[in-house]
Amino acid sequence: MLPILYPSNTSTSGFFQNNGLGFFNRCTKCEITEERNGIYELAMTILPSDRLAKTVLCGMFVKIKSNPHDDPQVFEIYAISVEESKITISGQHIHYLMNTNISTEPPVDGAADTPENLWSRMQIYFALTNPFSFSSDITSSHKILSSNNVNISLGEMLCGVVGSMVDIFGGELYYDNFHVSLLSRRGTDTGIALRYGSNISSKKQDSGTQTVYTHIAPYAYITLKNLRNNKESQYYLFYTGSNHENTIVIPNSILTYEKVLSYDFSDRMQDVVLRETSEGNFENWQDVQDRLQEEAENYISKYSAQLTQISANVEIDLAETLQGLQQCKLGDTVLIDFGDNGTTARAKIIKTVYDSLEEKYIKMELGQPKKTIADMITVKNLGGA
């Protein structure tokens, strides 16, 4: 498919009613890169002789096929580089516009709810009218965000800050132009097998274990209420188990030695109040400890793969790969046979590069996303690992 150019003032419906300013007719490269819960960008090159070369500007939009399955997607142009022999155009998926819609006050009302209901309730906190719709197959209820989330964007409410929907609920984001879905799981188990030396061109296994742990030491800063005078203060709570242990085991870690992750759960314990009696005892100590343990165990369950395994990232030469892989999607699961000592592993497709002109994938990456647990530790683990 040839890319189509639209002016910067195109309405939401206008992208799907006509061909805008027309097709680029001297486009030599048009690639779409998408990562799981990550970037979704356009890299495009045209010749100076293209009919739209003197028309295209930053802030305009390009509509183009971004994978074999979805309708053509809209990308906003954010950079143009002009050289004598070529013009390079960079764009980002239309959903990035959610990052420009900023909250006028902390978008939190303290009530637990499902993702769909939270999305609807939170709209009143944002400055601009929101053209994006939202759906989710996740039906559990949680609280999101906190009073610390001042001037965050609508996009950050979805993913990108402590207490965001992805942070609290987990799941995988799927973007289809002006509709956003938070799915418990994106993709399916394809049953396709990739074998090193047969249809895998290279393999790379990260040697670092920076984000792999055997234990977690949860802690939180919570509210302490003195029942003698009704005064409240901040209290540093650390986990104390039934045998006075201060850590919780992370199952199935590949490490042969012990390594502890110290982790701050303050944002998930904001509703907890520890009550101190007139005798100096804690009235609800065990309930508070049980809550901290529950939050830690939920975290372990949600991020088990990243906490326990070294990621195996595999780049695939799709020219030599099974034709069936062209029908796979971001988030699908395949079987990798490394060919050494019978080692096999199931891995998700976490990154795709799609050639929109040829309408085929030219690169896929399998494995665990690198930007998950490490980024969250940087933001949330105030006590250090």
Set out the residue ranges of the language-model regions:
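Solvent-exposed edge beta-strands and adjacent loop segments
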Residues: 1-37, 195-209
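Short beta-strand-centered interaction patches in the first periplasmic/extracellular domains
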Residues: 2, 9, 76-98, 136-225, ...
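Short conserved beta-strand and strand-loop elements enriched in small hydrophobics
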Residues: 5, 58-68, 331-339
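N-terminal export/assembly leaders
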Residues: 29-31, 37-41, 119-152, 305, ...
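Short, surface-exposed secondary-structure edge patches
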Residues: 49-55, 322-327
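Surface-exposed cap/loop segments at beta↔alpha junctions
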Residues: 51-138
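Acidic, low-complexity/disordered segments
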Residues: 89, 227-290, 294, 305, ...
